[in-house]
């Protein structure tokens, strides 16, 4: 396969992913919903984690685009093809996640918005499918255009996602939804899979 194919496919994966994010944000804005809650009304650990996560998520797409246009040494074709599959899977998971969450979807945690705990659909097998989708897209592009700066940026962002989940979101959801969320947390894994009733 020639480089034009890989470049076009990588750009399409990113366009679908970030386009979905932008469209959802605009749709929610038309309903007077503020999607981006990262760092808003926060203090302490929550503020630090969300601000750094916001920076990380801004850096990665820049690093991805620079990699697509500037990298000249590429991984073997089988790895790049695997990257395409992983990236497309990430797009699909993200679209389903955002659609299933409906108007309860936020980037970051809102202490003031009234939202519902969504536990059906894709959320019945993953408590954080949107974060999983980010990781899949990052991994997919990395497989197609591997370079060390992109790896560092992607890993840093993935670590910040994890810290956001563990240090901010899970604590917020437990406060907001109590035993309903605690029971859901016992049933469904953080990223993928369900647990047995015994757990």
Where are these regions (language model features)?
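Membrane-anchoring alpha-helices and their flanking helix-loop junctions
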Residues: 1-112, 116-119, 137-172, 176-199
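A short amphipathic helical element positioned immediately N-terminal to and/or at the very start
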Residues: 118-126
């Amino acid at each position: 396969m020639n480089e034009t194919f890989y470049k076009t496919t990588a750009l399409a994966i990113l366009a679908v992913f970030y386009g979905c994010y932008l469209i959802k944000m605009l749709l929610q804005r038309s309903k007077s919903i503020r999607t981006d809650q990262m760092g808003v009304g926060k203090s302490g650990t929550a503020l630090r984690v969300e601000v750094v996560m916001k920076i990380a998520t801004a850096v990665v797409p820049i690093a991805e685009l620079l990699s697509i246009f500037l990298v000249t040494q590429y991984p073997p074709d089988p790895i790049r093809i695997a990257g395409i599959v992983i990236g497309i899977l990430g797009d699909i998971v993200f679209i389903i996640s955002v659609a299933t969450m409906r108007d309860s979807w936020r980037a970051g945690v809102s202490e003031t918005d009234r939202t519902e705990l969504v536990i059906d659909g894709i959320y019945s097998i993953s408590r954080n499918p949107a974060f999983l989708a980010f990781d899949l897209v990052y991994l997919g592009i990395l497989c197609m255009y591997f370079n060390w700066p992109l790896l560092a940026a992607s890993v840093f962002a993935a670590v910040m996602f994890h810290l956001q989940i563990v240090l901010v979101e899970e604590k917020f959801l437990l406060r907001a939804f109590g035993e309903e969320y605690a029971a859901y947390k016992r049933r469904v894994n953080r990223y993928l899979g369900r647990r047995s009733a015994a757990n």
